[in-house]
Amino acid sequence: MKKRLFALSLVLLSFTARQASPQNMKTEECRIKLPGITFTRSLNHAADHAKVAGGRVTLASEARRDNFRDPDGKLSNNTAPLLLTEVDNKQPFTLTAKVTPTFLKTYDAGTLYIYVKEDLWLKMAMEMDERQKTRMVSVRTIGTSDDNNHDVIEAKSVHMKISSDTKTVGFYYSLDKKSWQLIRLFKNDYPASIWVGISTQCPLGEGTSAVFEDISLTKQSISDFRLGI
């Protein structure tokens, strides 16, 4: 009986260890501490490309780095650097950040993420589109990725917000951090343990970067999912 209990304990410990990092991905432990958040996992060597100064982090992307799983498989790319921290998805949470991307090539972007594994994630981005307009973009990936272009943003920076009350996830942006515009609402049917964080992408260019500041992760949700407040 003791041997069976010991074996069961080993199985449970192994399962717990596997759940301690984003699934099916090679991540590295890190500790990048900012006033409102501490990133503890680095995906695709993100920590090696992050510089912290004055309460902000600049995250660089090397050439041809992106996260997108095209339905036809031709453009799939899972190489963008992500800085992540774990969230208890059984509890409300809100992630906000001011994002200032450097736009050099089409699809360059600074992004916020909800991340579970390589083929299960959500992202919201300030991105340069095919007409060289900068706009809000959202992507939901469940096996393959959808792709949604939203409002054009003429400012150099934008405030982004992801909020969940455990049942619903909302994506929002603001130019003044006061008036928030809804982008998308999703059902929160993600696992009990998820990861949230930031990323920079450069699918077509030779590299770029984005500055993330005023980052905050709280254990509260917004109260109005239409107004984002």
Regions found by a protein language model. Give the residues of each.
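Bacterial Sec-dependent N-terminal signal peptides
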Residues: 1-25
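Extracellular glycan-recognition regions
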Residues: 23-229
